[in-house]
């Protein structure tokens, strides 16, 4: 296998046994592809598909005026260039968006509406459309946001029952529901009496036959559609004969003897069985004489008419009585059809429903539906018809969508998967038929938690829906104005007001429940957030109403949704994560890849199957044993079929899993030995990895899973080479790569400049910083890592640090999961993190004048101002602590009445001091740090201060430097190509005495000024043409760079677009260094979390035989009850990894022969698991590899395919460590050995973003609640601690009366008392006078608000 430039430097030993069939796909593809399809930017206007923006425009346009004389048609749209790039939008607090312009055509017809009178085309601006960044996020108002995908119930038809909960008898009441993509829901349901009702939009129920009547069916047609008939013939001799279909007698009790050929087959009172039916069939009985009483209770299928008089004896759907049977016989009716119903599998449901249906005609039915939908409005024929037509049959109001139509047709048993988006009569009849079949016991209800019935709605689709809503609002306004278009000669621009569209989009991206502030703690949390699937949100579930079934793991989640990663708490199971290989198909259903198996042989063909398709196949697991020839080896294999787990022989198997990690999500696949952890702890482990804070120096995990590189690569935090080439220049801030000739296109600069991100603030205030990995002269290929980002180490995800841990008690300090840490860890800054705080100071226009940012602040000492420059803004690099001034600002004060003395003082000492007050930006309490950046934004038309100009100059210089480098490398490249073309060619003449006919030499060119090269005239015309071409290229390149510079300069020097009333805004960024301290939360990757209880001096920590003190002491009681044994295995393997690293380090120090080093590395890498081709590396590369392995050989143990116990023992043995994984430890304080060997090794520990510094808080004096006058609560409000009921009881129990009085009065809500107290303290009189608490007044007012007067009478 070929290793990339960075992989070669440190190869991870992989214990995986299974072949890597499918690479881990691009992890952000779901988001990026969805939005790309929404925009269809790269496609030509005529070849765009009917989805996304194009689909939304097509569905709303053309808009025709009420009179029909004018129409506005949609032609195409185009998306412009964004005004600012992503970084500029983030720093200026803008939305990264591009203008959307739509080309429309206004067509005006003659009065007859046939011939075209006038056509006008014009481009109309439709507002700004947010664009997705390269990493799948949106920048909205300067902050990065993610639109989370939604898992919602797919449109289509669903059959269900109430699980026997509605009726006390526990009878199952079946129902059907037609859910459209947009429009009214249609429900059919049975009641306990087996009548069928219909509901529209969950309103009052009506008998279902009313809907059928409204569709135009009469009683006769309804009965014909839903029932088979039994024909009875009346003979002249008075006997009655039934046309017998033997099958219909099954399960009935014979009311009379059934005879065949004179023989009694079934005696009266006996139940007819399948054997009887077979005998009847054999005997060829097709008629059966029945007594007249047999007809009683049967239901008539048609109107029965007296042929003589034309009088209707009984109507269709009438139950026959003895009298009616007699009347029919008397009228001489020859044949009577009745409905075939029974209690077994042909219920009379439709007939019963017709009996309770009060309507008789179509109009009555329409009026009934109108009354139900619009209660209180008087119905008219037109209104009722319109309403009904618009409910399910109008494309504007109702759309099943292609998904809904596909699901609908498949569910009602049709083969065709396409069709119209609206319902028709056949659809409604098909739903009713299926519902009746299910009630009759023929058919299954649906499982709504099956992933074949839930689909994923991604960003693009949600944006399209919102856009369509905006367009529909525009449509209403345009239709009104279209009638004026002709008379007033309006242009399309004047007809369309795009505000509703812009507002809808802004609302969706800014404040939708699914548009979330991106979790940017570390690269993993970013990737996971973008791969999240939520069942909440508009059109989804709500936390309160979601039951257990929806939240539970379903068999169809296999390979689609992770069964482990979901939040704890009220959202458990409602917010899920996509599995590693999962993707959505064109209908939005999740699918997962499988390898095809043909005749027991596993192939490398991969098919993606959705949950519905998967149920049809027999699928083996990824770890099924496969021979060299690809045959499945075991006689019985563990398989899945139809959502059930079972066993099967190899010849039955049709598919096989692609990889064992396909069932879990990215975060869960980063947990080594996941298969040895309890599910609950695995859930905590995968969730806590997302909260890890990037440390100062990232440290790769010694024990990983092999997914680290993929996550780091796809998260976008590392810099990867876009094209291969040679590294030209590297410094801390940028990397310049000269691109390979074969990867550059003609005329473009063969240079890529990568500007690195330096100390940027993330959404969670963690620090984002990139560091170069390459050196000048390195040869890199496309996709190689050039620079590490936060929490990455050599292109691998590195969330924490490898710690030497011992599982043992230590003086009770690791009681209840507490963690004991060595001082060495703090000394070496292993867990020191940098947090960046953004503080903003805004100068506004006030009624009394403009606020001013200045260093001239009244009543402030010199020393407090010594960190500010002349503009009043703090210097970069200044170390500041709580209360220090960062930006000096003064606000005008209102004029006050002055005493004569004050007037005199002001006259003498000048105005300034007293008419302004100090409102400077100060460092908040509990914060200190270093100023790392300052940004100044000035409103257009306001003069910039010296600091703003200095910042501008620095930015322009950086851009100019980049462009100069680009120009220099481009020139070098062009002249080196020219040199190759000219040297050795014959010249016609040239500068510096180049004679005609002389040969151009390299020395001649080297001594000639490059600008004069173009004066050389060559004999070969091709060479002359090349000279001209290069000259033109260089000029074009210079012009383009100059234009680029001017464009950037324009943006930087222009005034800023600030909020109304804001004149100037200064943002100061503080870097706060947080060291590890007691109270910080730490965790491993197996859900083993705890809080640091104590930092122990290095010399007091337990140490090993060779004198190495451990870093962390964990409680051994944290393992058995939690059942996360993975942490112990990780510890063992980590110890082996570190031991092997030490041995390699010793070999390097002793300058061991290369052959021996290679042999040892071969033992390490190729003893088991995936093989590493060390022969492909040369000696220098092997040396570099060994050098990087000194700290430990990184291992990968993939989930469900990881290192086994013998392999771990083998590694420990190779490292020269005890196979038990335990060692004797000595007490650092006494030097004595502990009684028993202790489990010791290296575990990867994370520091989580729950830092004690952010939580500890104490109030001195602060704000009070307005009504109750009690102190506020919480750190954000600088609030106090609540002294509650139980605390009061405690003081009462001790009889501490004065303390209690103080707590309930002056320290809380006694307004007069607390001001008096302050005055007393100032006067040096430490007495307290308690007054009336404000809560008493609140109680009085509340009682008065109930209309009861209550007064306090004071003596």
UniProtKB/Swiss-Prot annotation:
Alphabetical list of InterPro entries matching this protein: DNA-dir_RNA_pol_bsu_ext_1_sf, DNA-dir_RNA_pol_bsu_external_1, DNA-dir_RNA_pol_su2, DNA-dir_RNAP_su2_dom, DNA-dir_RNAP_su2_hyb_sf, RNA_pol_bsu_bac, RNA_pol_bsu_CS, RNA_pol_bsu_protrusion
Record GO biological process: DNA-templated transcription
Catalytic EC class: transferase
GO MF term set: DNA binding; DNA-directed RNA polymerase activity; ribonucleoside binding
Any Gene Ontology CC annotation: DNA-directed RNA polymerase complex
Disulphides: none
Keywords: DNA-directed RNA polymerase, Nucleotidyltransferase, Transcription, Transferase
Gene3D superfamilies: 2.40.50.100, 2.40.50.150, 3.90.1100.10, DNA-directed RNA polymerase, beta subunit, external 1 domain, DNA-directed RNA polymerase, subunit 2, domain 6, RNA polymerase alpha subunit dimerisation domain, RNA polymerase Rpb2, domain 2
E.C. numbers: 2.7.7.6
Reactions catalysed: RNA(n) + a ribonucleoside 5'-triphosphate = RNA(n+1) + diphosphate
Assembly notes: The RNAP catalytic core consists of 2 alpha, 1 beta, 1 beta' and 1 omega subunit. When a sigma factor is associated with the core the holoenzyme is formed, which can initiate transcription.
NCBIfam families: PRK00405.1, rpoB
Protein family (similarity comment): Belongs to the RNA polymerase beta chain family.
Function: DNA-dependent RNA polymerase catalyzes the transcription of DNA into RNA using the four ribonucleoside triphosphates as substrates.
UniProt protein name: DNA-directed RNA polymerase subunit beta
